[in-house]
Amino acid sequence: MSNASAASNGVDGSTTKVSRFDPTFTDKVIKTTGPKANPRLAQVMPSLLRHLHDFCRENEITVDEYMAAVNMMNEAGRMSDEKRNEGQLVTDILGLESLVDEITYKLADEAGDAPTATAILGPFWRQDAPRRKMGDSIVSGIKDGDHTLMHGRVLDFDTGKPIENAELDIWHTAPNGLYEQQDPEQPDWNLRGRFTTGPDGEYNFYCLRPTSYPIPYDGPAGKLLTLLDRHPMRPAHIHFIVSAPGYKPIVTQVFDRRDKHIEDDSVFAVKDSLVVDFEPKHGDPKAQFDLQYDFKLASFEAAKQRGMKGATEVAP
């Protein structure tokens, strides 16, 4: 290929056909960043702009297509409030949150053991869930569903010792597939709660065995799934944020092994180590199933020694 017919595309230096579009435009945009710009933005924006501009050039995006994307973002913004984050849902179905989760929490550890794997936060977490006592139920006003005793320990993954004062923030859907803020028939804060471990690091509470459900598809995320000929289903799961003083918090989910969507989660969040078995429970009138799961946290000190990103403790 001659020099007249080849050029660098600006992203990775690979050779492509010369664009018939202004080859200097992207650099002009990048150079407008001022000397007092946020350091992290100044670092990442050139890469973002080059990839974004090259995408538009390579696919010859038209004004109509561009405006369709803008309108989708606008619609996601209009639909979002304290009870629903449609913009985050759109990124979820594109796998972006799961990818960022992997990048953010990947631990540079060569040991065979590791802290509990992370999974995406999702758009339905609510801040300040009610604090509950160990052994309480997070189920309120629901007669249907398979009641479950979930229990286990929160452990230091280096020493295996129990962690006192670890907080577990928990939430999951009702049998109808809706989180309580989506469903006016559910009591406020239903199927949510925060529990704090004692000296033994143990936790236990009653919940429901979760069911698979479709993500909300009445907005831009659903329209995009339809255009891509994809299903909206998520496998049954329970959400957790587990934190403790001096330890790196984790955001994660546990997934029911027997769910039929365990292999094709619409937001790509399932990890093998987070797949669990709900066992039949006998002798407990409050529960039909039993679920045992231990969470392992890395201390900030251990994280620093391994050179883990995000190893600095920050105020909540």
Predicted regions and their residues:
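Beta-strand-dominated extracellular/periplasmic modules and repeats
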Residues: 6, 10-316
